[in-house]
Amino acid sequence: MIFSILEHILTHISFSVVSIVLTIYFLTFLVNLDEIIGFFDSSDKGIIITFFGITGLLFTRWIYSGHFPLSNLYESLIFLAWAFSIIHMVSYFNKKKKKNLNAITAPSAIFIQGFAASGLLNMPQSAILVPALQSQWLMMHVSMMILGYGALLCGSLLSIALLVITFRKVGPTFLKKNLKKKFLLNELFSFDVLYYINEKNSILLQQNINFSFSRNYYRYQLIEQLDFLSFRIISLGFIFLTIGILSGAVWANETWGSYWNWDPKETWAFITWTIFAIYLHIKTNRNVKGINSAIVAAIGFLLIWICYFGVNLLGIGLHSYGSFTSS
């Protein structure tokens, strides 16, 4: 009873804090950041509180059940939210690159934890593991897979942001309009009047060109930073995913007598692994633009959710014990 009450308290604390943090981030888009810089820094500390809240929640279920809390969909979602909070904390201590990651990790953590705590998923009480999960490989395999999902989702979202910024039309339209006006003025006014008007226009035109170049330079810098962060995080997630698949193969051989059975979960995990292997291969080719790898990462984003929720929705295969019906 005490563990159940403590679990509910930690769940509500972490969810409430991360909700406040997300609200602060949205406010920073509406208000000048320099005016509320202290408010913004306090939101970063809020994610740290969320991290400890989720950590306490996981430890509470661990102590109460006697096994690592990754036996059902609810626990895996909480662990995924915990993974996003870890990524956020890493970016918090890396001051140069934290803002772009914060815009991804905070909303992701609140949506995942919100879904886990919603009415769609009942909060199951910790219970004895089913025979298929009673193995020392549970912590190794599932934790690596979830950490891999978290890092790959975060990196893929950064790539999607890169695509949005890249395809957004930003150009010196003011320059084109002024050139058209110049041709019309040449037809209507005398030389003295034109000289005065052209002087005024040249000043405005130069100011707009400087602004346009400055804006495009900032846009280019942002795209480069997103591409760099996406590559680093996806590389880390790919390592976790590889370790998770290999450890799962060893576990499958001990439990079912074969390393690979091609059930839905294994098949989609292999497809996801292949897509991100293609992403990393593209990144090693300097002749290929970053936009191509970002498109591959965006495809990988969809595949991760299919791999993560697909089997849970179907409730079939060797991994069906984590389905919605069983959680």
From Swiss-Prot:
Q: What are the transmembrane regions?
A: 13-33, 46-66, 73-93, 101-121, 145-165, 233-253, 262-282, 294-314
HAMAP family per the UniProt record, alphabetical: CytC_CcsA
Keywords for the protein's UniProt record, in alphabetical order: Chloroplast, Cytochrome c-type biogenesis, Membrane, Plastid, Thylakoid, Transmembrane, Transmembrane helix
Protein name (record): Cytochrome c biogenesis protein CcsA
Q: Has UniProt tagged this entry with the keyword Plastid?
A: yes
Q: How does it assemble?
A: May interact with Ccs1.
GO molecular function ontology, one term from the record: heme binding
- State the compartments where it is located: Plastid, Chloroplast thylakoid membrane
Q: Name one GO cellular component term.
A: plasma membrane
What is the topology of this protein in the membrane according to its UniProt annotation? Answer: Multi-pass membrane protein
What is the annotated role of this protein in its UniProt record?
Required during biogenesis of c-type cytochromes (cytochrome c6 and cytochrome f) at the step of heme attachment.
Recorded hits in Pfam families, A to Z, give: Cytochrom_C_asm
Chief place where the protein resides: plastid
The biological process GO terms on file are:
cytochrome complex assembly
| InterPro entries on file | Cyt_c_assembly, Cyt_c_biogenesis_CcsA, Cyt_c_biogenesis_CcsA/CcmC
Q: Which family does it belong to?
A: Belongs to the CcmF/CycK/Ccl1/NrfE/CcsA family.
